[in-house]
């Protein structure tokens, strides 16, 4: 029986006899063959569906490690800045270990589905003026001066936990893919995947993939080469204008012979709808930066026909239900409560 990440990959993680045995059964997420989109693009495309994690995003991988180590080291409280997914994950694992969780969010810039999770898990939530980068600056200063552990991706234990997704992909494919496509926000995850692939190459002899990272155009600090003071994109999970792991992300792309590129909101929304309507997979907008990037790079020839590609789908579509409604035409038929009229309407739908 699967026992969670800290047990599954203990030999690759900084755990010892003092590390709390904590898990919400994070990890072990499906690698879904995206058969219909594969046919359209001429590649072997898979989606690593991180929305299947306990709080609905990849953050659980790093958070179980970071919060467990915080508890091991005697901390009774954790703090983070968040656009949503980090807050949900931090609050869940803090609740599991009986710790206090303080979350600082940018006012009015967090999806309701994510905020609802943090509230349900009992976190203390503080809203401040500004954007995510302002919130991160604040919590870094507080954690440096107060007895509270910072659990944003600048915490190295987060990277240790998140690298396990690379292990899983290799285990599921029995090799690494040719290309890993991944959204880039604060840039911790791309860093973690590269670390994981490098470790598995040394341990098991698997090849390393080319890493293609994708920022949202309105928050593409790395691609544009400068901090974006007021980042704006429909993809709230990657609406970050000054990535904390900027240099590590660039290293991952360069060392893997990949690149970091950007995709527009229009490309993200196209991928978002395509994934749901042709594959039955519902991932939040930020997740679809990876798929949008795959489409862009196949069309430009940067991803070759026939290559094996894994697109990391970082979060569940239920995280941001407002976008699901606003980006699709909500056409609800109004029919009287008469069985024949209902049947006639259904026949019309089937025949259309």
UniProtKB/Swiss-Prot annotation:
One BP annotation, GO: L-serine catabolic process
GO terms assigned for molecular function: L-serine ammonia-lyase activity; pyridoxal phosphate binding; threonine deaminase activity; threonine synthase activity
Keywords, comma-separated and alphabetical: Amino-acid biosynthesis, Lyase, Pyridoxal phosphate, Threonine biosynthesis
PROSITE patterns per the UniProt record, alphabetical: DEHYDRATASE_SER_THR (PS00165)
Record field: catalytic activity: O-phospho-L-homoserine + H2O = L-threonine + phosphate
Pathway membership: Amino-acid biosynthesis; L-threonine biosynthesis; L-threonine from L-aspartate: step 5/5
Cofactor dependence: pyridoxal 5'-phosphate
Entries under NCBIfam families matching the protein: thrC
Purpose: Catalyzes the gamma-elimination of phosphate from L-phosphohomoserine and the beta-addition of water to produce L-threonine.
Enzyme Commission no: 4.2.3.1
Short name of any one Pfam family annotated for the protein: PALP
Binding site for pyridoxal 5'-phosphate: 85, 185-189, 314
InterPro entries referenced in this protein's UniProt entry, alphabetically: Ser/Thr_Dehydratase (IPR050147), Ser/Thr_deHydtase_PyrdxlP-BS (IPR000634), Thr_synthase-like (IPR004450), Thr_Synthase_bac/arc (IPR026260), TrpB-like_PALP (IPR001926), TrpB-like_PALP_sf (IPR036052)
Record-listed N6-(pyridoxal phosphate)lysine modification sites: 59
Domain of life per record: Bacteria
UniProt source species: Bacillus sp. (strain ULM1)
Gene3D superfamilies xref list: 3.40.50.1100
Protein name stated in the entry: Threonine synthase
SUPFAM superfamilies from the UniProt entry: Tryptophan synthase beta subunit-like PLP-dependent enzymes
Family: Belongs to the threonine synthase family.
């Amino acid at each position: 029986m699967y026992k969670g990440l800290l047990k599954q990959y203990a030999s690759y993680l900084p755990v010892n006899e003092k590390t709390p045995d904590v898990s919400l059964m994070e990890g072990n997420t499906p690698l879904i063959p995206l058969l219909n989109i594969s046919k359209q693009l001429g590649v072997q495309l898979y989606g690593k569906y991180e929305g299947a994690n306990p709080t609905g995003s990849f953050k659980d991988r790093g958070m179980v490690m970071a919060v467990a180590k915080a508890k091991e080291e005697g901390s009774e409280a954790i703090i983070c800045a968040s656009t949503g997914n980090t807050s949900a994950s931090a609050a869940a694992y803090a609740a599991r270990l009986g710790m206090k969780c303080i979350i600082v969010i940018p006012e009015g810039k967090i999806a309701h589905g994510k905020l609802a999770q943090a509230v349900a898990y009992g976190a203390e939530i503080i809203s401040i003026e500004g954007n995510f980068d302002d919130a991160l600056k604040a919590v870094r200063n507080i954690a440096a001066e107060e007895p509270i552990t910072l659990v944003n991706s600048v915490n190295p234990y987060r990277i240790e936990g998140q690298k396990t997704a690379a292990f899983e992909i290799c285990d599921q494919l029995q090799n690494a893919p040719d290309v890993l496509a991944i959204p880039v926000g604060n840039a911790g995850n791309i860093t973690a995947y590269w670390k994981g692939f490098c470790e598995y190459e040394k341990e098991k002899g698997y090849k390393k993939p080319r890493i293609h990272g994708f920022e949202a155009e309105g928050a593409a600090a790395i691609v544009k080469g400068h901090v974006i003071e007021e980042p704006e994109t429909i993809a709230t999970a990657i609406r970050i204008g000054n990535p904390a792991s900027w240099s590590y992300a660039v290293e991952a792309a360069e060392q893997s012979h990949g690149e970091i590129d950007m995709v527009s909101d229009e490309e993200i929304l196209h991928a978002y709808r395509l994934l749901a309507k042709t594959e039955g997979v519902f991932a939040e907008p930020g997740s679809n930066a990876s798929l949008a990037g795959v489409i862009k790079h196949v069309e430009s020839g940067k991803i070759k026909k026939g290559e094996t590609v894994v697109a990391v789908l970082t979060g569940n579509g239920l995280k941001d239900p407002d976008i699901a409604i606003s980006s699709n035409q909500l056409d609800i038929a109004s029919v009287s409560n008469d069985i024949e009229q209902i049947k006639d309407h259904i026949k019309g739908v089937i025949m259309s």
